[in-house]
Structure formats: structure tokens, C-alpha cells
Amino acid sequence: MREIVHIQGGQCGNQIGAKFWEVVSDEHGIDPTGTYHGDSDLQLERINVYFNEATGGRYVPRAILMDLEPGTMDSVRSGPYGQIFRPDNFVFGQTGAGNNWAKGHYTEGAELIDSVLDVVRKEAESCDCLQGFQVCHSLGGGTGSGMGTLLISKIREEYPDRMMLTFSVVPSPKVSDTVVEPYNATLSVHQLVENADECMVLDNEALYDICFRTLKLTTPTFGDLNHLISAVMSGITCCLRFPGQLNADLRKLAVNLIPFPRLHFFMVGFTPLTSRGSQQYRALTVPELTQQMWDAKNMMCAADPRHGRYLTASALFRGRMSTKEVDEQMLNVQNKNSSYFVEWIPNNVKSSVCDIPPKGLKMSATFIGNSTAIQEMFKRVSEQFTAMFRRKAFLHWYTGEGMDEMEFTEAESNMNDLVSEYQQYQDASAEEEGEFEGEEEEN
């Protein structure tokens, strides 16, 4: 029941995805060969959300790995859990997208997309009751952003009523990999606004900060960053995979988090984050979890929730705890910081409790917030985009692949519209309700 098909694209997506499968396999007691070595029936009860049972009792991830060059996939294949994936589910080209969105979306990616869709169909058909798809990708490169959004729009056509959840790594303000990131990211957001249901927004800088500040790592690697992301990914779906007192699934999350269809970009956080050495000295309590969860330093994207207001939020707790205490703590947060929540959506924080904590912890919590402050991030990308686009810098790489300048202009204005929508709801108050009703119907 309620299966999720996982798709990872491009270098970033494949590296995050590989880490995620290590975490999920570990939670369900699956070793790198796909054999079950767990100690509790609960690990097997709903293992089929992410795994398919193959012959001989082997468990195979419902994962599709795609890239336009073989490099990253080879390293996934030779990594710790590389042998667990179905060999047919590695779909790759040879040319690479060279950080060019147009190559991923229109030329190279378009040639490979049909073979990816064949694998997607095969995975979807082996599901009993498909809940949706989760896509891991970055928005700054060529494959994850260009081909990733192409795949999302194709899946949207074929499975219009299934949930589409993305984990999107946005270019960070200070750490830049390539000069054309603002172009690739803006073109991708333009697609995600229309075709995705829920986007969890991550960025490397915020993840680095968490590693430096909270985890006290002096030289964080991408492995450390990806570990943080996989903790959130596992937290979001734990309700589907383990029994709980208050369940959440992808659709319930969407219903509770998205007040207006375009505003589906969320900030995520995970707690407890403690440095490796100090972990065993602290027993966590629900109030402590709650406090760290709402801490701005805990957010995995470089936007400060204190600069905006929460439209909605969702807290997914794991471990043995009293639901009453969870409810009290969440209410407490809302009452104390009421100025950070919009008052025209009452009770806008949803919580769920799943009984099984992650490996090595007594209890944990995953946070998903729909905050108007996320506009800071879109604004930042948009400013960089405009600075280059005004001079038509680097455009020939895109027009050379058959793109039109109009597409850039459209993407730019769509992103600016998104920013002003967030701003509009940030400023809205319950008193002026009448003024908005007319506008609502237009959106």
C-alpha cells in the first residue's frame, strides 16, 4: 500500500539519493545486498512503501537513477549500497549536460527521457496503490534541473492525480559552483511552480552552517550535508512506513501545508542535531525538540523565517512520546510567537507522531514550514538572473540548443510573480479579508 517511487537525477540528486537509500535501508534492517537482517516485525510491515520484494526474499528499492553522464552513477554503483538497486534502473547518457539547462531539458535530456519514462512506468505498474513520486535534484546544474523538470512534467501528464514531491537543492548565496546557476535555477522554478505538488527547498550554504555551528564539524564534506538531507527525507515519509498514533502521508501534508496552489515551496529542518561526540550525554525532551525545531538556525535553506510569517507548518515527531505533550508544545510555540504566524489561518500547525524513532535516537522531529520568508531565496536568484540577462551574458549556450529569449523572460516574470504573491500574503491581515476575495478567484 501507498508506495512511493523515488527518482534521482544529475550529480547532486544521485549523491543525495545514494545517502537516502543508506538511511532507509538501515531503518528497515536491509543490508547492502538487499537481504533483511532486522530485529522487529515493524520494519517489514510496510517495507513496500520504498522496496519491492524480489525473488529469494531480496528487497529492491523503487528507485530510478538518471544522469546524462556515467560518472556519478558509477560511484553510486561502487558505493556502500550500490548493489541493492535494480541494474535496469540506471539510465544514463554519455555526453553530459555541461551545466546547461537547455541541454537537459530540450536536447540531450529529451533523447534520454523516453527510456527513463519506460522505467518509471515499470516501477509504477509494480505498485499496489501508488501514492506518488519523490524527485531528488539540484536546480543549479544541467541534468537535475533541466532533465529533472522535463521528467516531472512528463510524469505529471501520465499520472496527474499522484503526488509529486521534490527535494530541490537551490544555488546558495555564497557558494557557487557555476556562473549560469541563476539561469538554470530560474528556468527550473518556472517549471516547478506549475508541475510539482510539494518542493522541499534545500541549499548548501544553510547545510554548511548547520555543520559548522551545530554539529561542530570543521571541514564538512558533501557526505555530511547529504546526511542531513536524508534525515529529513526519511522523516517526511516515516508515517507511511511505520505505525503511528497520528499519521501523515504526502497528500495530507499537501492539504495542510498549501493554502494557495503556487505557494508550495517549503523550508525543512530536522532535530535533534547534536555534534557526534556530545550525543550520548543528553536525553531529549519534547520541549527541547520543539525549541530546536523552530530555531531559525535549524532551517536547511538560506532564508530566515523571522523575516516572514508562517502560512502553515507541519511537525512530524518520531519516538515514544505523549501526543498530549506534543500538542501542548506546538500550541505553546504558536501562542508565544503569534506574530510569526498569519492570523487569517487559525490552527495552522499540524503535527503527527510516529512510534519508531530513527536509528540511534530515542526521539526526533522533522519540520516542514511554508513561510513567506522563502521569497528571500527567490529574490536572490532573481537578482542574479536579471543582472546577467540584462547583458544577455551566456545566453548563446541556451539559444544554441534551440531556446528562445522569450522563455527566459517568462521564467523571470513567473519567479517575480511568485515573490510578490508571498509578499502579498505576508502583509495580509484578517481585517482586510474583503479586499482579497476578488483576487483569490483570479489566481
Swiss-Prot record:
GO terms (BP aspect): microtubule-based process
Classification via PROSITE patterns: TUBULIN, TUBULIN_B_AUTOREG
Main localization of the protein described in the UniProt heading: cytoplasm
Molecular function (Gene Ontology), one example: metal ion binding
Chain positions recorded as GTP binding sites: Q11, E69, S138, G142, T143, G144, N204, N226
Feature: compositional bias, Acidic residues: 429-443
InterPro entries: Beta-tubulin_BS, Beta_tubulin, Tub_FtsZ_C, Tubulin, Tubulin/FtsZ-like_C, Tubulin/FtsZ_2-layer-sand-dom, Tubulin/FtsZ_GTPase_sf, Tubulin_C
A GO CC term attached to the entry: microtubule
A Pfam family: Tubulin_C
Gene3D superfamilies (alphabetical): Helix hairpin bin, Tubulin/FtsZ, C-terminal domain, Tubulin/FtsZ, GTPase domain
Keyword Magnesium in annotation: yes
Necessary cofactors: Mg(2+)
CDD domains: beta_tubulin
Keywords, sorted A to Z: Cytoplasm, Cytoskeleton, GTP-binding, Magnesium, Metal-binding, Microtubule, Nucleotide-binding
Region span, Disordered: 423-443
Entries under PANTHER family matching the protein: TUBULIN (PTHR11588)
Family in the record: Belongs to the tubulin family.
Subunit organization: Dimer of alpha and beta chains. A typical microtubule is a hollow water-filled tube with an outer diameter of 25 nm and an inner diameter of 15 nM. Alpha-beta heterodimers associate head-to-tail to form protofilaments running lengthwise along the microtubule wall with the beta-tubulin subunit facing the microtubule plus end conferring a structural polarity. Microtubules usually have 13 protofilaments but different protofilament numbers can be found in some organisms and specialized cells.
Role: Tubulin is the major constituent of microtubules, a cylinder consisting of laterally associated linear protofilaments composed of alpha- and beta-tubulin heterodimers. Microtubules grow by the addition of GTP-tubulin dimers to the microtubule end, where a stabilizing cap forms. Below the cap, tubulin dimers are in GDP-bound state, owing to GTPase activity of alpha-tubulin.
Name by which UniProt lists this protein: Tubulin beta chain
Organism, as annotated: Volvox carteri (Green alga)
Classification of source organism: Eukaryota, Viridiplantae, Chlorophyta, core chlorophytes, Chlorophyceae
Annotated gene: TUBB1
